[in-house]
C-alpha cells in the first residue's frame, strides 16, 4: 500500500490483443505524473484458432506477463486499480479459462469490456490529454479491433468498434510474410470493406480535426521524425512509407529508418488499415493523441481531473508543482495578448494556435528559474520540452521550450519547428520578449501605456515619453532590445508620444 500522506497511486492495465500494458500514475497538483509504463508483447490474438478458441500457449504468454504486473500492483490500493480486457478476450470462446487464472495472479477482477465501452474510454483518454477545440475524429488501431469515435469536448457522438486490427490483418493478409503489392492491396481493400457500414454516419457527422491513438500511429510519428518530416500524418506520407516497406521482400527483412524492431512485425498490417481509413473517410491530416484507453481508465477513477479546459489544467498543475508566480505569468500573458491584438491578431500571426502558445509560454517562461537564474532560459526550455503537458503536442512542446529559452537577454534565431510557420514562430518570440521586458516590475498597475504597430516584420513601439523618463532602466532595456531584434533582421523602432 502507498504510504500515508503521500500522493495516491493509480494503475490502469489494458490486456490488448497485441500487447499487455500497465500504466502507473501519481495524482499530484491537479494532474497526473507517470510513474511507470510497462509493456509486453503477448500477441494474444495470434493464439485464436478458426473456432475462436485461445491456445494454451497464448494464454501462458498472458499469464507470464500478468505475473510481472502483479508485483507492482501490491503497492497500490485496490480501489485505485482498473484492469480491462479488449477485443481478443471478447472474442475467445474459452475466455473463462484465461480469466480464472489471471484473476488469481492479479488478485483483482478483470473487466472484459464491450467494443463500445472500449471506444468510449479511449475517447475519454483523448479528450483529457489532447488540446484543441471543435469536433474530433479519433482512430485507435489495436491488435484485433479498431475503434473510431467522433466527439466534441468530452462528449462522444458516435462510437464504433470494428473487427480488424494489426495482428488479425497480419494473419489474414500477410501470412506468407511477403511485402508485395498484392498483399498490401488485399489488406487495404479488406479494411475498406470493413469500414463500409459506418461511412454514411461518420461523413454526415463530420469533424474538424483527426487524431490517432494507437501504437501504429505512434510508430508512424517516430518514423517521420527520424526521417526529418513533421509530425502531421497525411495520405501521401502513408503511401511513401508503404513504398519503403515494399523495398523489403519479406517482413523479416523490413528496415525503415525510425521503425523499431518490436513494432516491425505488425507495422505493414497497421499501415494498411490506416491507409484504408484515410481513403474511405477522406482524411486530410492526423496527429498523435496524448492518451487513449489506459489514460481514459485513470481519468474515470480520479474525479478531480475532470474539467473542460485541458490546457488550463496543465498550466495550473505546472505552476503549482514548480511554485511559479501565477499572477505575474497572467500579467505577461495579458500584455502579450494585447500586443498581438494591436498588431492585427491572426492577420499578423496567422495560425490560431499562435495566440495559445504565446500565452502558455508567457505563463510558464520562468520555470527554469527554479533551477538557476544564470541559465534560466536553458532550464526553462529543457523542462517545458520534457515535462508531460497534456493538451500540447510534441511539436508544440518543442516550440514553447525554444521560445522560453529566448525570453530575455541574448537573441538568436529559432531552430526549425513544426508547431507554427517560421514567420509566425518568430513573431510570437518577439511579442513574448517585449511583454516580459515591459512587465518586469511585476505589477500591472506600473506597466506603461504602449501601442505596437506592424508593417510586415517591421515593428514600431510607441511609449509615453514621461514614463520612459521616470523609468530609465526600462528605457535602456528597450533600446538594447531594439538593437537586438534589428540586428537579427527583425526591425524594431521605439518612439515616444
Curated annotation (Swiss-Prot):
- Answer yes or no on keyword RNA-binding: no
The pathway entry for this protein reads as:
Purine metabolism; ppGpp biosynthesis; ppGpp from GTP: step 2/2
Gene3D superfamilies from the entry? 3.30.420.40, Exopolyphosphatase. Domain 2, Hypothetical protein af1432
Q: Which GO terms describe its molecular function?
A: guanosine-5'-triphosphate,3'-diphosphate diphosphatase activity
Output the superkingdom of the source species. Answer: Bacteria
What keywords would UniProt list here? Answer: Hydrolase
Taken from the record, one Pfam family name reads Ppx-GppA_III
Record field: catalytic activity: guanosine 3'-diphosphate 5'-triphosphate + H2O = guanosine 3',5'-bis(diphosphate) + phosphate + H(+)
Query: Which top-level enzyme class is recorded in the Swiss-Prot or TrEMBL entry?
Result: hydrolase
Q: EC number(s)?
A: 3.6.1.40
GO annotation (BP), single:
nucleobase-containing small molecule interconversion
- Extract the PANTHER family matched here: EXOPOLYPHOSPHATASE, RETROGRADE REGULATION PROTEIN 2
UniProt family annotation:
Belongs to the GppA/Ppx family. GppA subfamily.
Matching entries from NCBIfam families are given as: PRK11031.1 (NF008260)
The job of this chain, per UniProt, is described as:
Catalyzes the conversion of pppGpp to ppGpp. Guanosine pentaphosphate (pppGpp) is a cytoplasmic signaling molecule which together with ppGpp controls the 'stringent response', an adaptive process that allows bacteria to respond to amino acid starvation, resulting in the coordinated regulation of numerous cellular activities.
What protein name applies here?
Guanosine-5'-triphosphate,3'-diphosphate pyrophosphatase
Amino acid at each position: 500500500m502507498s504510504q500515508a500522506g503521500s500522493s495516491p497511486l493509480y494503475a490502469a492495465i489494458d490486456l490488448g490483443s497485441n500487447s499487455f500494458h500497465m500504466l502507473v500514475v501519481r495524482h499530484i497538483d491537479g494532474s497526473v505524473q507517470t510513474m511507470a509504463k510497462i509493456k509486453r508483447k503477448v500477441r494474444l490474438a495470434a493464439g485464436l484458432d478458426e473456432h475462436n478458441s485461445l491456445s494454451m500457449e497464448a494464454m501462458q504468454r498472458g499469464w507470464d506477463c500478468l505475473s510481472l504486473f502483479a508485483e507492482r500492483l501490491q503497492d497500490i490500493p485496490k480501489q485505485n486499480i482498473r484492469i480491462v480486457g479488449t477485443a481478443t478476450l471478447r472474442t475467445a470462446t474459452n475466455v473463462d479459462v484465461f480469466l480464472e487464472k489471471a484473476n488469481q495472479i492479479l488478485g483483482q477482477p478483470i473487466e472484459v469490456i464491450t467494443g463500445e465501452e472500449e471506444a468510449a474510454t479511449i475517447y475519454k483518454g483523448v479528450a483529457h490529454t489532447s488540446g484543441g477545440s471543435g469536433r474530433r475524429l479519433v482512430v485507435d488501431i489495436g491488435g484485433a479491433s479498431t475503434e473510431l469515435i467522433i466527439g466534441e469536448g468530452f462528449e462522444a457522438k458516435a462510437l464504433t468498434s470494428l473487427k480488424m486490427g494489426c495482428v488479425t490483418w497480419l494473419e489474414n493478409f500477410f501470412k506468407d510474410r511477403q511485402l508485395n503489392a498484392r498483399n498490401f492491396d488485399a489488406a487495404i481493400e479488406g479494411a475498406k470493406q470493413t469500414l463500409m457500414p459506418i461511412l454514411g454516419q461518420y461523413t454526415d457527422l463530420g469533424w474538424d480535426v483527426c487524431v490517432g491513438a494507437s501504437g501504429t500511429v505512434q510508430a508512424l510519428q517516430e518514423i517521420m521524425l527520424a526521417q526529418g518530416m513533421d509530425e502531421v500524418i497525411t495520405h501521401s506520407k502513408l503511401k511513401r512509407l508503404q513504398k519503403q516497406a515494399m523495398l523489403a521482400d519479406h517482413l523479416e527483412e523490413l528496415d525503415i529508418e525510425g521503425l523499431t524492431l518490436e513494432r516491425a512485425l505488425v507495422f505493414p498490417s497497421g499501415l494498411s488499415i490506416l491507409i484504408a481509413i484515410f481513403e474511405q473517410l477522406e482524411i486530410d491530416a492526423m496527429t498523435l493523441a496524448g492518451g487513449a484507453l489506459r489514460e481514459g481508465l485513470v481519468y474515470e477513477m480520479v474525479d478531480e481531473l475532470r474539467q473542460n479546459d485541458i490546457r488550463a489544467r496543465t498550466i495550473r498543475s505546472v505552476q503549482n508543482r514548480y511554485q511559479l508566480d501565477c499572477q505575474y505569468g497572467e500579467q505577461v500573458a495579458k500584455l502579450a495578448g494585447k500586443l498581438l491584438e494591436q498588431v492585427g491578431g491572426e492577420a499578423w500571426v496567422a495560425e490560431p494556435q499562435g495566440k495559445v502558445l504565446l500565452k502558455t509560454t508567457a505563463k510558464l517562461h520562468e520555470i527554469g528559474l527554479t533551477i538557476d537564474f544564470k541559465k534560466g532560459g536553458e532550464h526553462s526550455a529543457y523542462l517545458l520540452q520534457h515535462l508531460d503537458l497534456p493538451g500540447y503536442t510534441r511539436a508544440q512542446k518543442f516550440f514553447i521550450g525554444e521560445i522560453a529559452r529566448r525570453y530575455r537577454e541574448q537573441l538568436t534565431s529559432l531552430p526549425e519547428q513544426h508547431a507554427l510557420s517560421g514567420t509566425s514562430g518568430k513573431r510570437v518570440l518577439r511579442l513574448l520578449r517585449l511583454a516580459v521586458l515591459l512587465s518586469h516590475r511585476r505589477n500591472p498597475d506600473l506597466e506603461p501605456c504602449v501601442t505596437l504597430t506592424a508593417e510586415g516584420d517591421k515593428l514600431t513601439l510607441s511609449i509615453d515619453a514621461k514614463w520612459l523618463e521616470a523609468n530609465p532602466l526600462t528605457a535602456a532595456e528597450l533600446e538594447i532590445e531594439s538593437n537586438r531584434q534589428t540586428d537579427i533582421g527583425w526591425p524594431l523602432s521605439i518612439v515616444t508620444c
